[in-house]
Amino acid sequence: MLTYALVALGSAIGGTLRYWLSMVIAEASAGTFPWATLVINVAGSAAIGLFATLTSVDGRVFVPSEWRTFFMVGICGGFTTFSSFSLQTLALAQDGDWLAAGLNVVGSVALCLLAVWLGHVAATIINR
């Protein structure tokens, strides 16, 4: 039960950080390129990579498993799910499974873009 509470708290923190940072970046940048999303996804990926490695079995920092979950699933997940995707893809590549890593990248991007488009089409039909 504690782990669920930690994930919920971490998600709230991560989501709040994402919203705040996206507002800061949006004010600082101009144009239509999604700078805030890019920066947040890259920052979240860097954070989960750093934390996962530092707190792994071979890492220099001991963190109980529920606190790893709090940060990696809760905060990073609330901040961006792209961080989990990046960590999982890195794990595939490090295991030498380059085909699976590549398919994960291409498949995720293609399927997510398709899903966004299908959702848009469905909403457009509903809105008529």
Curated annotation (Swiss-Prot):
Recorded topology in the membrane:
Multi-pass membrane protein
Q: Where is this protein found?
A: Cell inner membrane
**What superkingdom heads the lineage?**
Bacteria
Q: What modulates its activity?
A: Na(+) is not transported, but it plays an essential structural role and its presence is essential for fluoride channel function.
Q: What does this protein do?
A: Fluoride-specific ion channel. Important for reducing fluoride concentration in the cell, thus reducing its toxicity.
- Cysteine disulfide partners in this protein: none
Tell me one GO molecular function of this protein.
metal ion binding
Entry similarity comment:
Belongs to the fluoride channel Fluc/FEX (TC 1.A.43) family.
**Binding residue positions for Na(+):** G77, T80
InterPro entries from the xrefs? FluC (IPR003691)
- Keywords from the UniProt entry: Cell inner membrane, Cell membrane, Ion channel, Ion transport, Membrane, Metal-binding, Sodium, Transmembrane, Transmembrane helix, Transport
Report the Pfam families cross-referenced here: CRCB
Which source organism does the UniProt entry give? Paramagnetospirillum magneticum (strain ATCC 700264 / AMB-1)
State the Gene Ontology BP annotations.
cellular detoxification of fluoride
Please give the GO cellular component terms listed in this UniProt entry: plasma membrane
Recorded catalytic activity of this chain's protein: fluoride(in) = fluoride(out)
**Per the annotation, which location comes first and is thus the protein's main one?**
membrane
Annotated membrane-spanning segments are 5-25, 32-52, 70-90, 106-126
Protein name per its UniProtKB record: Fluoride-specific ion channel FluC
Residue stretches in coiled coil: none
